[in-house]
Amino acid sequence: MASITRLDAVSPYLIRRFKNDLRALDAVKQSNCVYVGNLSFYTTEEQIYALFSKCGEIRRIIMGVDRFTKTPCGFCFVEYFENQDALDSLKYISRTSLDERIIRADLDHGYEEGRQYGRGASGGQVRDEMREEFDPGRGGYAKNRQPTSSRQLANYSGISSAPLGSSLELQSNPRYNRWKKN
């Protein structure tokens, strides 16, 4: 049998997070603050304002920044004046595209000082540190990804012999410089 899912409902993540605290879950349902994730590192506050203001009057936008470099790290908080505007943004804007990325929006219990900083070990978001693939909109490879020579050393350190005429030393690829005359 088919079912219909409400688009302005609290996410399964928040239900799991507040499963033992129904008061906190009810407070989130009445919140006028929206967490927006999966933003490009290059998305501006003006772009977010232009998109989210279509659902109601915005009180403020707080951009998430890297804890160390203070550069955008792919999330923000949008505070509306009314709860209904926040719910409308979940219905109409969540899972839409902004800067060629599908954004995620969810109700949030409210912004507090310090929450604008990424919580990952490298200063950004935790999910970016776990990413395996190259993502140009989120700064390329994950920040904790090892350089190629370190991975080669770990993968091939057990090899102790080589065919005659070859070497076991790791070779780095020289960078091609198109401006250098050969």
Curated annotation (Swiss-Prot):
Annotated SMART domains: RRM
Tell me the ranges covered by the RRM domain, including all copies.
32-110
Q: Where is the composition biased (Polar residues)?
A: 145-175
Locations of Basic and acidic residues compositional bias? 126-136
Q: Which Gene Ontology molecular function entries are recorded, alphabetically? A: RNA cap binding
A cellular component annotation (GO) from this entry = nucleus
Keyword annotations for this protein, in alphabetical order, are: Cytoplasm, mRNA processing, mRNA splicing, mRNA transport, Nucleus, RNA-binding, Transport
UniProt keyword Transport present: yes
- The UniProt annotation places mRNA binding at Y13, Y35, R104, A105, D106, L107, D108, R115, Q116, Y117, G118, R119, Q125, V126
Q: Where found, per UniProt?
A: Cytoplasm, Perinuclear region; Nucleus
Name the segments for region: Disordered.
114-182
* A GO biological process held by the record: mRNA transport
Q: Which residues form a coiled coil?
A: none
Q: Where are the transmembrane segments?
A: none
**Which top-rank group of organisms is this from?**
Eukaryota
Has UniProt tagged this entry with the keyword ATP-binding? no
Free-text function comment from the UniProt entry: Component of the CBC complex, which binds co-transcriptionally to the 5' cap of pre-mRNAs and is involved in maturation, export and degradation of nuclear mRNAs.
Entry's family note: Belongs to the RRM NCBP2 family.
Q: Which PANTHER family match?
A: 20 KD NUCLEAR CAP BINDING PROTEIN, NUCLEAR CAP-BINDING PROTEIN SUBUNIT 2
Q: How does it assemble?
A: Component of the nuclear cap-binding complex (CBC), a heterodimer composed of cbc1 and cbc2 that interacts with capped RNAs.
Entry protein name: Nuclear cap-binding protein subunit 2
Q: Which organism is it from?
A: Schizosaccharomyces pombe (strain 972 / ATCC 24843)
Which lineage is the organism of this entry classified under, starting from the top rank?
Eukaryota, Fungi, Dikarya, Ascomycota, Taphrinomycotina
